[in-house]
C-alpha cells in the first residue's frame, strides 16, 4: 500500500449537486493511481481539525497529472465544508492513494458486469467503469439517489461504451421511483462480476442477493481516523474468521463479498 504525501494544487472546484462538490487536484501522486476504488486522505485547511478526511478517487488523468474527487459537505463546522471553500491555486495536504481498490485484471470482453452504486458511494465507480470499458465487457450500471437534486455523474457514465445505465430516486423525482434494489430485481442475466459501493443497507441487500457470486466486490464506507491501519477505528467483522477484524482503510475499502458479515 502506498503511503505517499504531497501538497497538491486545487485546479478547480464546483458544486455539482446539492451539497456535493467536485474538486480537481493536480500533483505527482496521480502517478501512483492504478486501482479504482482507492481513496485520498485530505488535511482540513489551516490545521482547523486534527483528523484528515477520507475521500474516494472518482477519476484521474495521468497525462495531466490530475484527479477528481466528489464529496458531500456538512454544516459550517465540518471539515468537508472547509474543504469546499478552497479556490483554484490553493494547496492541500494529501496522503494517498490509500487502501485496496477494485480488481479489474481478470475481466474479459465476454464478461457481463453489474455495477451498483448509491448516493455518495457512486464516485469511485466511475473510474472503475472507465477501466472496465477498455476490456470491451458489457456493463449494466444501477445508480440510486435520494432525489434528482443529488444525482451525480449520469452523463459521465452514459458516455462510456457498452453501458446500460438505470437510475432510481427514492422520491421518484428522476428515473424509477424507489431504491436501487428495485432495479437490481430487474436483472435478468447471469452476472459474471459485481462491483458495489453505497450505504450499508444497500450493500447488505446486494450481498444477500448475490451471496453465491465468486466475484462480488464490495466497497465499504466507514469513519476513519489514521487512514493507514494503525488505529483500528474502521473495523468490520471478518466472516471467514470471527477472531479477526478487517480494517476498512488498509484491508479495504474494497472486499470480496465472502469476507464480510453484513
Curated annotation (Swiss-Prot):
Hydrolase as UniProt keyword: no
One GO CC term on file: cytoplasm
Assigned keywords, A-Z: 2Fe-2S, Cytoplasm, Electron transport, FAD, Flavoprotein, Iron, Iron-sulfur, Metal-binding, Pyrimidine biosynthesis, Transport
Pathway: Pyrimidine metabolism; UMP biosynthesis via de novo pathway; orotate from (S)-dihydroorotate (NAD(+) route): step 1/1
Protein name stated in the entry: Dihydroorotate dehydrogenase B (NAD(+)), electron transfer subunit
Residues noted as binding FAD in the record, renumbered to the chain: 53-56, 70-72, 79-80
Gene coding for it: pyrK
Protein source organism: Lactococcus lactis subsp. cremoris (strain MG1363)
Highest taxon of the lineage: Bacteria
HAMAP family noted in UniProt: DHODB_Fe_S_bind
Cofactor note: Binds 1 [2Fe-2S] cluster per subunit. Binds 1 FAD per subunit.
Function according to Swiss-Prot or TrEMBL: Responsible for channeling the electrons from the oxidation of dihydroorotate from the FMN redox center in the PyrDB subunit to the ultimate electron acceptor NAD(+).
Family, as annotated: Belongs to the PyrK family.
InterPro entries noted in UniProt: Cyt_c3_hydrogenase_gsu, Dihydroorotate_DH_ele_sf, Dihydroorotate_DH_Fe-S-bd, Dihydroorotate_DHASE_ETsu, FAD-bd_FR_type, FNR_nucleotide-bd, OxRdtase_FAD/NAD-bd, PyrK_electron_transfer
Cofactor(s), by name: [2Fe-2S] cluster; FAD
GO molecular function annotations of the record: 2 iron, 2 sulfur cluster binding; electron transfer activity; flavin adenine dinucleotide binding; metal ion binding; oxidoreductase activity
NCBIfam families found in the cross-reference section: PRK00054.1-2
Binding positions for [2Fe-2S] cluster per the UniProt entry: 226, 231, 234, 249
Amino acid at each position: 500500500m502506498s503511503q505517499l504525501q504531497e501538497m497538491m494544487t486545487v485546479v478547480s472546484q464546483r458544486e455539482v449537486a446539492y451539497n456535493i462538490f467536485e474538486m480537481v487536484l493536480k500533483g505527482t501522486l496521480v502517478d501512483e493511481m492504478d486501482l479504482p476504488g482507492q481513496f485520498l486522505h485530505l488535511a482540513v485547511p489551516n490545521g482547523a481539525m486534527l483528523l484528515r478526511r477520507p475521500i474516494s478517487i472518482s477519476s484521474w488523468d495521468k497525462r495531466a497529472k490530475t484527479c477528481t474527487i466528489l464529496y458531500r459537505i456538512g454544516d459550517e463546522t465540518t471539515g468537508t465544508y472547509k474543504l469546499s471553500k478552497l479556490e483554484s491555486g490553493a494547496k492541500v495536504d494529501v496522503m494517498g492513494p490509500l487502501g485496496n481498490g477494485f480488481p479489474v485484471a481478470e475481466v474479459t470482453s465476454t464478461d457481463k458486469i453489474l455495477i451498483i452504486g448509491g448516493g455518495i458511494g457512486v464516485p469511485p465507480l466511475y473510474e472503475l467503469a472507465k477501466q472496465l470499458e477498455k476490456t470491451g465487457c458489457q456493463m449494466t450500471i444501477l445508480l440510486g439517489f435520494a432525489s434528482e437534486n443529488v444525482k451525480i455523474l449520469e452523463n459521465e457514465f452514459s458516455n462510456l461504451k457498452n453501458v446500460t445505465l438505470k437510475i432510481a430516486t427514492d422520491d421518484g423525482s428522476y428515473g424509477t421511483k424507489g431504491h436501487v434494489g428495485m432495479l437490481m430485481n430487474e436483472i435478468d442475466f447471469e452476472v459474471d462480476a459485481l462491483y458495489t459501493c453505497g450505504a450499508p443497507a444497500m450493500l447488505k441487500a446486494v450481498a444477500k442477493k448475490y451471496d453465491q457470486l465468486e466475484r462480488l466486490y464490495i466497497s465499504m464506507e466507514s469513519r476513519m481516523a489514521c487512514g493507514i491501519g494503525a488505529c483500528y477505528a474502521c473495523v468490520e467483522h471478518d466472516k471467514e474468521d470471527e477472531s479477526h477484524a478487517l480494517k476498512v482503510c488498509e484491508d479495504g475499502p474494497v472486499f470480496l463479498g465472502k469476507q464480510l458479515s453484513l
